[in-house]
């Protein structure tokens, strides 16, 4: 009586043929997250400095942001992406490095938009650091 073994099936990733997309770069003081979506907002590929193995203060470097953008760009090029609009959010150090890495990966950047949320004097900010 051999037990019926369950076939280990994984859903195959469908190659979408998408020409244009949007790169959402969220650059905080601690990390940089790059998500590439189609024009409707459906994610094609994403990457972050932390997901690539950068830990601690190395996550917030421009080099880590560059690597994250390259990884996300490679994943989106596999789906046929050619042109990008870039939206950048946050005050982090990896903003420009991530945009340059997307261009260097072979994607044509058509527009760069800064969508950093600015409060109309909302929450009290954290106290000033004394080093």
Swiss-Prot record:
Gene Ontology molecular function terms on file: rRNA binding; structural constituent of ribosome
Alphabetical keyword list: Ribonucleoprotein, Ribosomal protein, RNA-binding, rRNA-binding
Pfam hit, one: Ribosomal_S11
Domain of life: Bacteria
CC annotations in GO: ribonucleoprotein complex; ribosome
Biological-process GO terms, alphabetical: translation
Family: Belongs to the universal ribosomal protein uS11 family.
Annotated function: Located on the platform of the 30S subunit, it bridges several disparate RNA helices of the 16S rRNA. Forms part of the Shine-Dalgarno cleft in the 70S ribosome.
Assembly and oligomerization: Part of the 30S ribosomal subunit. Interacts with proteins S7 and S18. Binds to IF-3.
Name by which UniProt lists this protein: Small ribosomal subunit protein uS11
Source organism of this protein record: Bacillus pumilus (strain SAFR-032)
